[in-house]
Amino acid sequence: MKTKRILASLMMSMTTIGLWAQVDVHSHAITASYMDFVKAHGAEMDEGFPIPEWNVEDHLAFMDQAGIETAVLTMPAPQPWFGDGAESAAFCRKYNEECAALKARYPGRFLFCAALPLPDVKRAVEEAVYALDVLHADGVKLATNSYGQYLGDPELEPLMEVLNSRNAVIITHPHKPSAVNDKLIAEVPLASYEYLAETTRAILNMVAHDVLVRYPDLKVVVPHCGSFLPNALPRFKGLLPVMIKQGYMKPVDVDANIARLYFDLAGAATDDAVRSLLTITTADHLLYGSDYPYVAAPALVAAKGSLQQRLPALGLDPQAVLSDNARRLFGAAVPIREYGEKLVRLAEIEVVPEKLEAYLKYASEVGRISMATEPGVIALFSMQDKTDPCKIYILEVYADQQAYQAHIQTAHFRTYKEGTADMVRSLKLIDTVPLVMAEFVKKAR
């Protein structure tokens, strides 16, 4: 029984994760022009946390290391509005055109959701139309509040109408509330707690104004594992009848509004956080998000690998969370990866019976690390002979010969090879010529 459990772990850890293009819906493009604009207004510490450095080469390197095919770019905080609507609109136009250029320069690697010069609603509508219709933005990014103007505010109705008419994706992101004690920010950065409250506040304000029911073609993404919504929603629903009776609110269909939301798993996507999130949404509305570059790339790669390994135990399909749900949300904007010829081989391994459990542990670990950290390792799929459990077959798919050579030189592969040297009775490697790789990959999706 123990051997079967270890084998199940091995199968899960070595399952194919590279056959489908993974999508990161939560990342930020911190362009030089953005930093210059923010610094010119003395706002680089406006959110109580330093704005990290960013460049496209490092972003792509992180994506390759993490196995991410496509990232959705958005503007970070703070919102580029400092009292002059025309200035803000001009900068948002410049920023959106820069993001559109990145999308064009690296086809398939980047999408972008446009920045809008809120709280100037008229100019925001104009920029939304230009970004979506001319630049072919993949959606818009809206701050939870723009200097006190919260999502759900009736002032935003003209913008919601325009976005709804274009079936727009809205990426929401927390920003500093207008009335915040500066001393409090200095001691405990907003991102550690207030961002979660801020997101919850904004989404519940949208629900209270029935925005998502009245504009059913909007697709709104909530960041950071739903923030405090799983905890706040039961209280909100419980108080709603009283609020309606007292005339503070109008009747709204809370569940219908919440059902239209999508949720990214950026931040601390612990098992408990994901389980809590699933009390208010469904598996097909969960999306992967990194929050790059606000977290160091090595930490993000490790966290993504951990999440990917834990999803099945939570009853979730890694392919759906990391790829399919985002592909459905953004439609044709997310490219289908094209595959040429790959290096494909089959390993036939006979393991010493009394060392089978130890071998499977080694194999599980090398599979987990390889799939999480090596973009050139497309698939490591293990199988056990039904009649002889000591016979293990591993289907290996590599991007090319170079990827295979790089794989066998890694520290984790060497640990596996040296640690199992006395566990293997025989090893046979069969190199193959893939005849229908493209068709296989399409079917595997």
Predicted segment positions?
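Bacterial N-terminal signal peptides
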Residues: 8-18
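Active-site gating/metal-coordination segments in enzymes
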Residues: 69, 75-203
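Short glycine-enriched loops at secondary-structure junctions
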Residues: 29, 118, 174-178, 293-295, ...
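Mid-to-C-terminal alpha-helical segments outside catalytic/metal-binding sites
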Residues: 3-5, 25, 29-70, 97-104, ...
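Hydrophobic faces of well-ordered beta-strands that scaffold small-molecule active sites
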Residues: 23-27, 71-73, 111-114, 140-142, ...
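Active-site gating loops and adjacent loop-to-helix segments of metal-dependent hydrolytic enzymes
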Residues: 31-54, 89, 178-199, 236-260
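Aromatic-lined glycan-binding groove of carbohydrate-active enzymes
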Residues: 207-210, 216-256
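Short S/T/G/P-rich N-terminal loop/turn motif that feeds into the first structured element of a domain
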Residues: 335-392, 397-414, 425-445
